[in-house]
Amino acid sequence: GPGIKASHKIDAPIYLQDVMATSLDIAGAKRPAQVEFQSLLPLLRGETAESGVKAVYGAYLGLQRSVTVGNWKLILYPKISKARLYNIKRDPLEMKDLADNKKTEKVIKRLYKRLLNLQKANNDSLDLKAAFPNLG
């Protein structure tokens, strides 16, 4: 689009749904009220270096919840009480689960707290505390 450098890579967290708001902005169309996400146009044009997204929250049915903050991604599977932790900077393909490593215990607890706050903000009623009583 106009004002956007070709082949310019941006390493900032975003939501996939931001693409809709961005497409509408590029097209010059009015954004409908139901489009809740943000346009990435200021980021793409170099007007800002940050997306404004501090934590990426993920939910898949009643089967999975996740949060990504900085280099860390925590994925919880409440039906089987399984947690997985990845350093996505060092391990972008998420091959080495660090959840059982004693050194990452504090990281997991911090991300879990953040995930609970994001659940509340998104009116997500899935009870993670019952499946993960030791994380809180």
Predicted segments, located by residue:
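Phosphate-coordinating loops and pocket residues in cytosolic domains that bind phosphorylated ligands
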Residues: 97-100
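C-terminal cap/loop subdomain of S1 sulfatases and analogous C-terminal strand-loop tails that border
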Residues: 3-6, 12-88, 93, 106, ...
